[in-house]
Amino acid sequence: MLKIKKLTVQYGPLPAINEISLEIKHGEIISLLGPNGAGKTTLLLTLSGILKTTEGRIIFEGEDITNLSPHQIVSRGIGHVPQGRHIFPTLSVIDNLMMGAYLHRNEKKEIKKELDSIYQLLPILKERIHQRAGTLSGGEQQMLSIGRAMMGHPKLLMLDEPSLGLAPRLMDEVFATFREMNQKGLTLFIVEQEILLSLSISERGYLLRNGRLIKEGSASTLMESRELITSLGEYPPY
């Protein structure tokens, strides 16, 4: 589905990511792990078209999408839930969701279909449809951010630190939603500091350090990996 070939991104004196190669297959949940500053967010921003590559190629479903614009990336079927959610707090839930439907803004039937699908998956959003987004709880705001990305009807959804700022109970709810999304056919690429939580729903994972890929393997292999423990110091509590 997605192949990254020797990707380098540099926007300072040193590469933020350096000759990274990885692959994501249809229907997988993949974790991208590493300490702060490893290059995880940079990789997602590059895949989203927000940052430009210095070298390397990005292939999605057989098409070279290297350095396409963000809206072109979305139109190909890649969604991105950024770190920090970035919702519009003064707008209602439905208005925030509609922000994600700009590619289908003239297709009312398609928009209704997507909304119905999102309300089925995330029923709390339907209950809060006219509520201002800024008054939602942290977990509800995360669900809204996910729902907005889903309005673009992605085939691959990338999530950057989805557990950030959430209580453990809410983390479990959010990650249970990810499992359900995956069971419905969506491929997920998750950047997450809650290592055990992320690996618990993933088939495979990749470990970055200082912009380089240093380890890849099954979730069970990574859980026992000396490289993972060394990179992060210790497993985060969960």
Regions found by a protein language model. Give the residues of each.
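ABC-type ATPase nucleotide-binding domains, specifically the catalytic core motifs of the NBD
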Residues: 12, 30, 93-111, 121-123, ...
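The feature captures the beta-strand-to-loop junction immediately N-terminal to the Walker
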Residues: 33-35
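Helix-to-loop junction immediately C-terminal to a conserved catalytic motif
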Residues: 48
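Conserved ABC transporter NBD signature motif
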Residues: 56-63, 76, 110-115
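C-terminal boundary and immediately downstream tail of ABC-type ATPase nucleotide-binding domains
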Residues: 120, 204-216, 220-238
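Conserved ABC ATPase signature
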Residues: 132-136
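ABC ATPase C-loop
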Residues: 149-150
